Amino acid sequence: YRKFIGKYFKGNRVNEINRNVTPAKYRELFGQLSARQKEIIEDRESRCIVVAAGPGSGKTRVLVHKLASLLLLEDVKHEQLLMLTFSRAAATEFKQRLMQLIGNAAHFVEIKTFHSYCFDLLGRIGNLDDVSGVVAKAAEMINNGEVEQNHIGKTVLVIDEAQDMGSDDYALVSALMAVNEDMRVIAVGDDDQNIYEFRGSDSKYMYQLSK
C-alpha cells in the first residue's frame, strides 16, 4: 500500500492520504500552527522529542495539538497515551483545551500529575503526609516487575514542564521507557524556568531523555 501511494502520489498529497481526517478538518485543527510547530505535530518517527522554549512561545498549544494529532492522525488509542504534569491545574487545563479540539474523546485520555499517577499505580489514595517518596517507590516497583504490564503499557508518554523533573521523576520516566521499548516520549519545557529547583528539579533531566 505504501509503495503504491508513494509511486502514484507525491509530496503533500501523500501526507493527506495518510491522515485519518479530511484536508478541511486538518486545516481547521492545525492550519494556524507555525512551520516548526507543524514539524513537531507531524513527526511520527522520533522516539524522543524534546521541545525547549520560553514563555509565550506556544508550548502549551503545541502540546495540546500534538495530543490531538496522536489521536486523530496516527493510530494511537487513548488508552495507549499518558500525559504527566506537575500540577492538577495544568492537568485540568490540558484536558479542557483538548476537549475544545477533539470533543468528549478527551475524557478518555490519561492526563495526571506525576504523584497522582504513581498513587494510582500503587493502589493508594494520595495524602499530603505520604507524598514525598511515592514517585521513587513507583519507579522501583516498575523496575522490579511488581506492576502489571496492563497498568503501565503505553506507546506514547507526554511530559509537560519537563524542566521541573527531579531525579525521582526521571527515574519513573526511565522505568516506563525500559518496560515499553517502543514507547515515544514527547517532553516540553523551558530550561530558564524551574520553579521546583528547591526540591532537586533540574532541566538536565529533560535533555537526558533524548540521549
Question: Predicted segment positions?
Answer:
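Short basic/glycine-enriched coil/helix segment immediately N-terminal to the Walker B
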Residues: 43, 133, 140-157, 178-181
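SF2 helicase catalytic motif II
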Residues: 152-169, 186-187, 192-193
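Conserved RecA-like helicase ATPase core segment
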Residues: 171-211
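Catalytic P-loop NTPase motifs of RecA-like helicase/translocase cores
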Residues: 40, 58, 70, 118, ...
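Structural preference for long, well-ordered alpha-helical segments in enzyme cores
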Residues: 63-67, 90, 94-98, 138-145, ...
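Conserved two-lobed SF2 helicase motor
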Residues: 110-116, 130-142
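P-loop NTPase Walker
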Residues: 1-127
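Basic/charged alpha-beta structural segments of nucleotide/phosphate-handling enzymes
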Residues: 1-13, 146-152, 157-158, 189
